[in-house]
Amino acid sequence: MESRHAIREAAFQALFALATNPEADKDAVYAEVLPQDTEVPAYLTTLVEGVLSKQADLDAALTPQLKKGWTLSRLTKPDLIILRLGLYEIRYEEAMPEAAAINEAINLAKRYSDDQSAKFVNGILANFIQATPQA
């Protein structure tokens, strides 16, 4: 598993499994989402550990991007995980271009949710970038 796209997809699957069962062993989850006898890629652990450790910050940054009256708890679990993963890459993975992070998040939404979710994810992440002052 060498492509960043495949690693990102495995990260989504791992984060979804851990959100569903927070007591799950991460190594067991990685074994489930990776092809058999595959070493855990460093970027996979970076994404999963990063999203989990920064979850409160990510959620705080996502909340203002929602429509008035909406909360994160109203989102579907896949959409929320995709948004967290995309925002993590935008905020903390400096080598990742913002547009590429959004595109990858859209692709995950199309695969694991639907076209409406893909548009929603695009809008939320694009709004975040637009609302964030550039350095």
Swiss-Prot record:
Under InterPro entries, the record lists:
NusB-like_sf, NusB_fam, NusB_RsmB_TIM44
Lineage, top-rank taxon, reads Bacteria
Q: Tell me which UniProt keywords the record has, alphabetically.
A: RNA-binding, Transcription, Transcription antitermination, Transcription regulation
SUPFAM superfamilies this protein is in? NusB-like
Query: What Gene3D superfamilies does UniProt report for this protein, alphabetically?
Result: NusB-like
Signal sequence segment: none
Q: Which Pfam families match?
A: NusB
Single GO molecular function:
RNA binding
Q: Which GO terms describe its cellular component?
A: cytosol
Q: Its Gene Ontology biological processes?
A: DNA-templated transcription termination; transcription antitermination
Recorded family membership: Belongs to the NusB family.
HAMAP family associated with the record: NusB (MF_00073)
Q: What does this protein do?
A: Involved in transcription antitermination. Required for transcription of ribosomal RNA (rRNA) genes. Binds specifically to the boxA antiterminator sequence of the ribosomal RNA (rrn) operons.
PANTHER family in the record, alphabetically? Answer: ANTITERMINATION NUSB DOMAIN-CONTAINING PROTEIN (PTHR11078:SF3), N UTILIZATION SUBSTANCE PROTEIN B-RELATED (PTHR11078)
Give the protein's recorded name: Transcription antitermination protein NusB
Query: What taxonomic lineage is listed for the species of origin?
Result: Bacteria, Bacillati, Bacillota, Bacilli, Lactobacillales
Q: Which gene encodes it?
A: nusB
